[in-house]
UniProtKB/Swiss-Prot annotation:
Enzyme class: lyase
GO biological process: terpenoid biosynthetic process
Keywords: Lyase, Magnesium
Source organism of the structure: Sarocladium schorii
Name under which the protein is recorded: Alpha-humulene synthase asR6
Keyword Lyase tagged: yes
Biotechnology: applications noted: Xenovulene A is a natural product exhibiting little structural resemblance with classical benzodiazepines yet is able to displace high-affinity ligand binding to the benzodiazepine site of the gamma-aminobutyrate A (GABAA) receptor and could be potentially used as an anti-depressant with reduced addictive properties.
Length: 430
């Protein structure tokens, strides 16, 4: 049965969507912060003395941790400093957004515009294909695999990637006018249900995505918003983490990689460690982008202003997030997830393209084959029929069975399980 929660109603206005997520998430530690709400106050995180003995916790063995005292060894790092707390001003940001939505039209002239910053991007569906490449790359760096039973979870990551590169109207996302590689948002929610994700987990991931789509759209639609955030690292970080939706992606990643014998992992039971990991990933992503010279000038640049001081503060947050995660119940997943930015940024085409002058690298045949099955060609507009030509030339059409698993029909003949046809892409990473 498809998910039929009230929050899927396609008739809601943008303002009503905003109110829905305010009601769903509620306030965090700051009164009036919903939906930019956090239960963890990063400015209050305390660093525990390092005894040099980690036998009490295996968590230290996961992820990439660079201790505070060793940072001066790296020319791209240095010392740390506690950030001045601006978190309690988040209610001012919420009030500003409330007022903007009172006067904002439902549709803006720039809705649908490409915002990737890469001049060669001209077709939103081609941009979506690159976003799918990036989504799968993130997934494997987090520690996932490309097995077919996680197809819709990976499509979810694709939906989370695309609003950074295309200005998407929240209404069109919700009502199905907008399609990601031919898939509507309702398709994704129904697919998650077919994959066995529980209704509560789906609703949490759904609301996280709504929040991301809204905050991404707002940062592009409202020219007065980002100036209120820039130069205030803890305040900008709160907003920036929501625009990346690292929390919703983490919830589905944990669903995919948790040991079945331990049962499902719910945000309600693990909110503390999950929030810290979602913040940590954005911090390590920005640390790595700064090291490669591609952070400065981004819309949600957390170190804007006094960049040298803001970078000290960013490193301060990273060190404390990683140490706290060391002792958490799911450290084996969360420390890798939280520190993944340090290793995926220098490896992924998404960031290497920016280093190379904001160009695009060709999608090679091997990648094209992997990406082809994520395209719903029956629903692509005519002008996008030629995307991924190297994958399309294989004449392989993806089909779903009742369990959300992919089968392939090759040239109209035998149906093959993905695992039988492409064993090389089912290998777990990490």
């Amino acid at each position: 049965m498809p998910v039929t929660t009230p929050t899927k109603m396609a008739t809601l206005t943008t303002k009503q969507m905003w109110q829905t997520i305010k009601d769903y998430f509620g306030d965090g530690f700051v009164t009036g912060s919903a939906p930019i709400s956090y239960n963890v106050h990063t400015c209050d995180m305390q660093l525990q003395p390092d005894s040099g003995i980690h036998a009490a916790s295996d968590g230290i063995h996961y992820g990439v941790q660079i201790s505070e005292d060793s940072m001066p060894l790296f020319s791209i790092m240095g010392d740390t400093a506690a950030p001045p707390c601006t978190c309690h001003r988040v209610d001012e940001i919420v009030k500003h957004i409330d007022e903007f939505l009172e006067r904002a039209p439902e549709a803006l002239p720039d809705d649908g515009a490409i915002t990737s910053g890469k001049p060669c991007d001209t077709n939103p569906d081609q941009v979506s294909l690159y976003a799918m490449r990036d989504s799968l790359s993130w997934w494997v760096h987090w520690g996932g695999n490309l097995r077919p039973e996680h197809y819709w979870k990976q499509i979810y990551i694709g939906f989370a990637a695309i609003p950074d590169d295309v200005q998407i109207s929240p209404r069109e996302f919700l009502d199905g006018t907008y399609r990601y590689l031919g898939h509507t948002w309702d398709d994704c929610l129904s697919g998650l249900e077919e994959e066995g994700v529980s209704p509560d987990e789906i609703e949490f991931a759904n609301m996280c995505m709504w929040r991301q789509m809204l905050t991404q759209w707002l940062e592009k639609a409202d020219p007065e918003l980002l100036p209120l955030l820039k130069g205030k690292i803890s305040l900008m970080l709160q907003y920036r983490v929501l625009t990346a939706n690292t929390l919703g992606c983490l919830a589905l990643f944990m669903n995919a990689t948790a040991d079945p014998k331990d049962g499902p992992i719910h945000y309600a039971d693990s909110s503390y460690e999950m929030e810290i990991a979602s913040v940590a990933q954005c911090v390590t992503l920005d640390m790595a982008k700064e090291a490669m010279g591609i952070l400065q000038g981004e819309r949600t640049e957390v170190v804007a202003g006094d960049r040298a001081q803001r970078k000290r503060e960013l490193r301060w947050i990273y060190v404390r997030c990683m140490q706290i995660l060391e002792s958490q119940p799911h450290a084996h997943m969360l420390r890798r997830y939280g520190s993944a930015g340090l290793h995926y940024v220098p490896m992924m085409d998404r960031y290497l393209e920016r280093v190379s002058g904001h160009t695009r690298f060709p999608i090679r045949d091997g990648a094209a084959r992997i990406l082809e099955r994520f395209i719903n060609r029956a629903e692509l507009p005519k002008e996008s029929e030629d995307i991924n030509p190297n994958g399309r030339s294989l004449k392989v059409s993806a089909k779903m069975n009742g369990n959300g698993q992919l089968h392939h029909e090759v040239n109209g003949n035998a149906k093959l399980h993905l695992e039988a046809e492409r064993p090389d892409v089912t290998t777990a990473v990490g």
